[in-house]
Amino acid sequence: MRSPASSRRASALHRLCDSCRACGLSKVRCSKEKPTCSRCRRRGTVCEYVVTKRPGRKPDSRSEVEPEPGHLSHPLPSPESSTAISQGNLPDPDAFDPLFALPEPFDSTPELHSGPLSTVDSSLSSALTTWCPDFDDFFSFPVSTEDTLSGDRGAVYDGTIKHPPNLRRHSESPPAVPDDTIYLFGKPVDPAPPDQSLPATTTIGRRASPPSGRESEAGSRRLSCRCLIRALDLLKHFEVIRREAEIESSLPSIDAVVEVNKQTTEAITGMLQCPCSQKDGYLLVLLALIVCKILDRYAAAAIPGTEQGHDPTRRLDEGPMAGQRVLGELHCIQRVMNQLGPRLRMHGAQGASPGQAFHGTPAPLSVGLGDQLEPELHQRLSRLSSEIIRLLREAQ
């Protein structure tokens, strides 16, 4: 036998609606007369009062077994799994908890999920179910409390870092954690001092534009062309040799003289191949002086008594052999003079043009100086060869 409380609960659960079904569908006010309202009586329709559907638990639902709280909590990923995900070792998508998966389309309305869009929906659903952000790795990233704008405000972000290193899922190695947040404003500046020969950048993080062909060629010539310094070194070397000979009170051997003069002649030939020898008049004057030094050394080695302050009898190499050796080397000097002479005349003509002497011309040759240097070199060479030939004839 049922108790009064259970009967009242049952009657409350099965309460009828205030409006009949016909008035409810027509959305008009019902007279609430039972068993037939006045509107249904007037229309001649069936008046039916349905049972109300109250929200809430179903009766006797507490008797069912409630799920344990442990099944509803999702375990947090361990640090090992976070490291594996950050290094590119993604877990199997099928191994994810179904709580994070999107619900499948409703089966009650198949017409809404059929057609060409069903494939796109299914692919999007599968892509979203396999995505799992690594939040543990993200929150473990240290954040500096310093002001990020207190650094170099002139830095320009060059766009090479598209996302923070901790969100890279497919990197080869775990990202290096910087000490501060200055990496957000561009690449760090190299503490090493820059090369003075390279163009300096005016903005940190901005790469200098590559030089053009003409600029690079001019820069290479500026760095590699040291002809004027080499010419001065050759003159200094001749002075050192002269002072050493004075200290030793003896003349060098013919082999040493020929070897030094041959190396000097090759150096002059290399300088004449440089483009600066066609523009720099100072270099041409120095080369002419070096040629005079070479001829003087050949004369001192081949002709007895030419070198002042030394006894001709103390020469190591005497006789016609030294003259023949020097005479065989004069053709190299002749080739150098054939290249040097026209350039001396050209710069002498430029110095003779009006106004060149007062506008910073690179040619130090005054009017007629180039025309005087070239004949002087040829006269020295001609006198030396004539004297050597005379001595060789007398020795016979």
From Swiss-Prot:
One of its GO terms (molecular function) is zinc ion binding. Residues 54-120, 190-218, 346-365 are annotated as: Disordered. Residues 72-82 have a biased composition (Low complexity). InterPro entries: AflR, OAF3, Zn2-C6_fun-type_DNA-bd_sf, Zn2Cys6_DnaBD. It comes from the Eukaryota. Specifically expressed in conidia. Disruption phenotype: Resulted in loss of trypacidin and questin production. GO terms for biological process: aflatoxin biosynthetic process; secondary metabolite biosynthetic process. Pfam families: AflR, Zn_clus. Residues 57-71 have a biased composition (Basic and acidic residues). It is found in: Nucleus. CDD domains: GAL4 (cd00067). Keywords: DNA-binding, Metal-binding, Nucleus, Transcription, Transcription regulation. One of its GO terms (cellular component) is nucleus. SUPFAM superfamilies: Zn2/Cys6 DNA-binding domain. Induction: Expression is positively regulated by the transcription factors brlA and laeA. This is Trypacidin cluster transcription factor. It comes from Aspergillus fumigatus (strain ATCC MYA-4609 / CBS 101355 / FGSC A1100 / Af293).
